Amino acid sequence: MAKAAAPRIRKKERKNIISGVAHVLSTFNNTMITISDAQGNAIAWSSAGAQGFKGSRKSTPYAAQVAAEDAGRKAREHGMETLEIEVSGPGSGRESALRALQAVGFSITSIRDMTPVPHNGCRPRKRRRV
């Protein structure tokens, strides 16, 4: 029986991009951070689930902070220094993700809230009664 060839893994090259955009999507269940260049090509990404948080711990501000630090560290390896931040979603990890990106060492030029607001579109889900 012939031996299967091992898949070749290419080493990621350093991209040398100075400025970019951090897209922070904070839902009720998770927080996802994607750092892209000005054209929208993803450079680095991370999420609370990818950092090992499971279940309701994914929606905590601390999980968002850990995910933002990880994505920021990956983007710094590509030479990124300045960020514009686009925040969307109603979750609890919005502010802590911003603070974590600032703590990594990025200079933040602008913060935009891109949360979609309906002009009376779809019917919302039923209200929670606790």
Curated annotation (Swiss-Prot):
- InterPro entries of this UniProt entry? Ribosomal_uS11 (IPR001971), Ribosomal_uS11_bac-type (IPR019981), Ribosomal_uS11_CS (IPR018102), Ribosomal_uS11_sf (IPR036967)
Please list which residues make up the signal peptide: none
Q: Provide this UniProt record's keywords sorted from A to Z.
A: Ribonucleoprotein, Ribosomal protein, RNA-binding, rRNA-binding
Which GO biological process categories is it annotated with?
translation
* Single annotated GO MF: structural constituent of ribosome
- The answer to whether the entry has keyword Ribosomal protein is yes
Can you supply one Gene Ontology CC term for this chain's record? ribonucleoprotein complex
| Source domain of life | Bacteria
Pfam families, per database record = Ribosomal_S11
Disulfide connectivity for this sequence is none
Describe the task this protein carries out.
Answer: Located on the platform of the 30S subunit, it bridges several disparate RNA helices of the 16S rRNA. Forms part of the Shine-Dalgarno cleft in the 70S ribosome.
What family does the entry list?
Belongs to the universal ribosomal protein uS11 family.
Supply the NCBIfam families for this chain. PRK05309.1, uS11_bact
Q: Could you give the subunit structure recorded for this chain?
A: Part of the 30S ribosomal subunit. Interacts with proteins S7 and S18. Binds to IF-3.
Identify the PANTHER family for this entry: 40S RIBOSOMAL PROTEIN S14/30S RIBOSOMAL PROTEIN S11
Q: What is the name of this protein?
A: Small ribosomal subunit protein uS11
Q: What does the record give as the organism's lineage?
A: Bacteria, Pseudomonadati, Pseudomonadota, Alphaproteobacteria, Acetobacterales
Q: Which gene encodes it?
A: rpsK
